[in-house]
Amino acid sequence: MKTRRAFALGAIAVLGLALAISATDSLAQQKQRVSFSIPAENSKYVQQHVIEVGDTPGHEVRVYELRRSFPGNAPAINAVKVKEMIGSGMSDYVDGTGPNSNYTVFVLENGEKFFSRGTTLAQNTGSGKLSTVSVARITGGTGKLLGIQGTVRTTGTANPKANFSEAQYEIEYWIEK
């Protein structure tokens, strides 16, 4: 009788410990969502190099660096505010319409970073501005963000020739151990 009781108590303790560990793991991997907008005054094309392809009028290949800052109301990732976003990319547009491959470094206030790789589709709206839709995969991070994974979705408006870019972001992420 005593051995059954000891076994049952031991089994309950092991089961409780297993549940606590799995609950901790699921909390660590719980998906988080962050949504925010970046107005044009907080975005700047730092460098752009445009090459006319020459096969079709208006066909341009462009390499660029786009920096976005958060002077106020910064979003937080893992409870730390984002300080800056540094995007590098290459577009292949005909009259402002076409694909764009890009990489972004998200720099947090504590110096940690996470990275994404994405694809953007731009469409010329006819007013010199481009309507953009992007999807990016989070590829990793540093420090406490080492196991970060997730998706970055963006919609926006841009006019690279006028150094204008504004966007709305939705980041869904989790941190794996």
What are these regions (language model features)?
Residues 10-22:
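Bacterial N-terminal signal peptides
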Residues 5, 23-26:
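Serine/threonine-rich, low-complexity intrinsically disordered segments
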Residues 2-12:
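Bacterial N-terminal signal peptides that target proteins for export
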